[in-house]
Amino acid sequence: MLMDVFSSFDAHSYNLIWLSMPLWLLSSMVPMTVLFSDVHSKSGSTSSFRSLVLSFTYSMIRLNGKGLKLSGFPLVMSGLFMMILMLNLSGNFPFFFPVSGQFVFGFSFALSIWTCLVLSSLLCSFEQGLMSLVPTGCPLILVPFMVVVELISGMLRPLTLVLRLTLNLGAGKVILTMCSSELVVGWLNSSSLITGVGGIKGLLMGGGVFGAAEVAIACIQCYIFCVLLCLYTEDHSS
């Protein structure tokens, strides 16, 4: 089958897709193991790593919204951050299917967390939840129109969030794939003066740069996804 730069996002182009399943399972189980194991211990690498992850996510939540006031939200975001980060990083390995770059994956988390935040806000204070649909100082005649606009914009939040994650991961992987392919082709077509050990070193250095860029994109997009979910708590009722 003819392969192109978008074939890495097509599950049917992976004849060995079953190799990705252990890594998916590991990416799902590691956050639970790190966050809930060795709870009563105050020493050890697992406890230190858990403290580091929790402190980072707690600071992220504290600076972006009112998530610390919601019971269980920091723990959910800590596990989600670790899982998406590991899946983003695992998608950079050869022959591993990038499941985090799929629309359904991100949409399931974005929709479920956004729905829980909306329901929690309405249950906490139904009046404040409805008042958030009307901007401050809005003329009375425009209230029905603004309510419809706010409802539509609110319901589009999960869609825009997952599109941002999927498109950015996809665009980054496509660009890096094209650049790395051009690098390999250029090295293979180069003259004998720059081949040999020097050419191999240049190829390895170029591959290292592109690999570091892929890791940076995976980390940044995971952080942006979780930060935007935290910002949705700004509209939560007090």
Curated annotation (Swiss-Prot):
It comes from Mytilus edulis (Blue mussel). Signal peptide: none annotated. This is ATP synthase subunit a. The gene is ATP6. It is found in: Mitochondrion inner membrane. The keyword Cytoplasm does not apply. It holds the Pfam family ATP-synt_A. The chain crosses the membrane at residues 16-36, 79-99, 103-123, 129-149, 209-229. F-type ATPases have 2 components, CF(1) - the catalytic core - and CF(0) - the membrane proton channel. CF(1) has five subunits: alpha(3), beta(3), gamma(1), delta(1), epsilon(1). CF(0) has three main subunits: a, b and c. SUPFAM superfamilies: F1F0 ATP synthase subunit A. Mitochondrial membrane ATP synthase (F(1)F(0) ATP synthase or Complex V) produces ATP from ADP in the presence of a proton gradient across the membrane which is generated by electron transport complexes of the respiratory chain. F-type ATPases consist of two structural domains, F(1) - containing the extramembraneous catalytic core and F(0) - containing the membrane proton channel, linked together by a central stalk and a peripheral stalk. During catalysis, ATP synthesis in the catalytic domain of F(1) is coupled via a rotary mechanism of the central stalk subunits to proton translocation. InterPro entries: ATP_synth_F0_asu, ATP_synth_F0_asu_bact/mt, F0_ATP_A_sf. GO terms for molecular function: proton-transporting ATP synthase activity, rotational mechanism. Its main location: mitochondrion. Belongs to the ATPase A chain family. One of its GO terms (cellular component) is proton-transporting ATP synthase complex.
